[in-house]
Structures are given as C-alpha cells and as structure tokens.
Amino acid sequence: MGVFNVEDEITSVVAPAILYKALVTDADNLTPKVIDAIKSIEIVEGNGGAGTIKKLTFVEDGETKHVLHKVELVDVANLAYNYSIVGGVGFPDTVEKISFEAKLSAGPNGGSIAKLSVKYFTKGDAAPSEEQLKTDKAKGDGLFKALEGYCLAHPDYN
C-alpha cells in the first residue's frame, strides 16, 4: 500500500467558530442547500461523532453516485475535524481510502486559516494522478468557498 500526502491551507474572512459550524456542525443539512451537485448527506451508522458512517450522494457527469465518509474526530473546542472516504460508487479502484485532517484557527482581521492534510492510501504502489489531485482540490476548494459564501450572505448565521 502506498501513502501519498497533500497539504493545503486556505484563508477566509469568516470567523473560525462560524466557519466550523458551517463546515462541520451543520454541514449535513447546509451543504446540499448550497451545492446543487450534492443531493444529500445522511448518517448510515452512528450518532455523528467518531466512528459515524455518512453517505454523501451527488451527481457527477449526469450520474448519481455516492461516497461513504467515516468520521474519525470531531473536536469542537479545537475546531478540528478528521474523516476518511472509505468507499462508494465512483470511488477510484486504485484507492483504499482518502483521509482528511482539517483544523481551523484564527486568521488576520477576525477571519480564519484552514489547514488541511489529505492522505491517499492506495492499493499497491499506485499513486493518485495529477488529474485526480487537481480535481479533488478543486472540489474541496469549491465546497469551502460555497459554505464560506453562505456565511457571508447570511450575517445572522452563527
């Protein structure tokens, strides 16, 4: 098995606690409302905490697909959230799982700094393609910006 790590950092003008609420606490309900391609996020097993399995259903290239998220850590006090994508329809055959470790912290002017570590656990020595890495980053950035946009458009959201 190969392990390939990608680090990313993005800033936001939204305060960390409010952004965490949108990205983590309210994400199951909020994300399908702000991103048309995401149809639903539902808990398959668990109570929302560590060990919970969620099914995220989305439309890509005209096809309905889904991925399974396994929640690894929910740390509201430290604004951290870790999860892994562990399977689903449309999940790459060469990948066992993709793990995400996200943490928000205070940024300039009351905003946030989001740090993300993504680990691709591949089958054999297969490496994720540059195309896959670019596509996955674009999807992640799009999700972040959509939820950030929701917070900015709804100043009473907190």
UniProtKB/Swiss-Prot annotation:
GO-annotated cellular components: cytoplasm; nucleus
Name this protein carries in UniProt: Disease resistance response protein Pi49
Pfam families: Bet_v_1
Domain of life: Eukaryota
PANTHER family from the UniProt entry: OS08G0374000 PROTEIN-RELATED, STRESS-INDUCED PROTEIN SAM22
Annotated GO MF terms: abscisic acid binding; protein phosphatase inhibitor activity; signaling receptor activity
Any single GO BP term: abscisic acid-activated signaling pathway
This protein's record includes keyword DNA damage: no
The species this protein was found in: Pisum sativum (Garden pea)
